[in-house]
Every structure is written in C-alpha cells, then in structure tokens.
Amino acid sequence: MALRLLPFRQYDEQDVVNLFALTNAEALESTTGDGVGSNGVFVKVADGNFDQELISYGSNSYLGKTDYPFVNSDMYPTVQLEVTAADSGEAPLGLTLNQTAKTDENGEKLIYNTTKKEELQAVLPGQTVPVATKGIFTLGKNALAGDSISAAGITVGAGFEVADNGEISGVSATTLGMVIGTGSRTSSGGLTDQFAGDYVVIKLG
C-alpha cells in the first residue's frame, strides 16, 4: 500500500508547498505498490529552475496511443519543477502528503476517475504533490528505516533525520524535529490492518 502517513496529523496549509511534482521515474505504477512515490516520503528539490516554462506539454504513453496518422495528438501536461526522495545526509524540503500513482488497485488509470484519485490521496504523474514543511504527522512502519522502531533507532523525545529513500531514522539531536510518540498496530477481529506494525508520531520543524 502506497500510504506511509496514518490519519492523525496536524498542520497548517500555509506550511505546505504546492510547487513541485515528483520526478516521473519515481511515480508508482499502482496505488497497491510502495516506494518513493508513496505519501509520507521526505523529498528534496531536484529541479528548481524558475527560468524554464513551469508546465510543459508532450506525448505520454500514459494517455495510450497518441500518434495516430492524420489525427491531432493529445498532449500531457507536466510540471517542470520537481522533487525526488531525499537520502541520508541530505536536506529535505519536507514530506509528501499524497502518493503519486498511475493506476488504482484494479489497474484502472486514475486520470479517468478524479473522485477515486482523491479518495486514494493520490496525484497523477507530472502533477504537483503537496509537501508539508512543518507539523505533526504519524508515520507507518514503511516510512522507517528497517521497517521497525528498533531498526530505525527511534527514541521518544529524541530527534530524527532522513535515511535513504525518504525514510527516517533516529538521532540524539533534534535535526529535523522530534519523535513525540510511538506505538504498534495489529490485525484483529479477523480483519487485516493494512497499517499493522510499528508507527511513530513526529513533530516536523
């Protein structure tokens, strides 16, 4: 599942940057996958050149076949300013609030179902992805280095930093913010919890 952010969060829209798209190569093929196209990923600026056209138009296989002879072609808009997953030792802009994905769990293209796209907390490849720079957020195990609190070295009251692929790990100093709580979720009542495992609550900024 391409969601690393759990529902509990507190942030101000003034602390959200809506300028950058995730690099196309990092977009998820499906919302059932997990990767740097998920939400809750710490990202850095990959392209911040404001001298270029902010939106470009071109052919894109995501639209299907677009080069029929003697027929006008469809052009796909893409935001040129881009972010990419931050790695260890790099300064992140913030963490993504939406996933970037092409299709839903049934393989249906999200470009044709805007309502479902919103329900899945997704944006399309090339669309701006909201990036939070400050606030309180709950991150699932797939946002932690090593997929667990112990492997990531997370300690309540201590700081955290960016690990590889936009995940986080614990540090003694409050580098990016502070870990203010931890917990774990389990499946129960015969129902599968898609967020089962460790989770942490962080104060960013």
Map each language-model feature to its residues:
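Surface-exposed, low-hydrophobicity beta-strand/loop segments enriched in small/polar/acidic residues
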Residues: 1-205
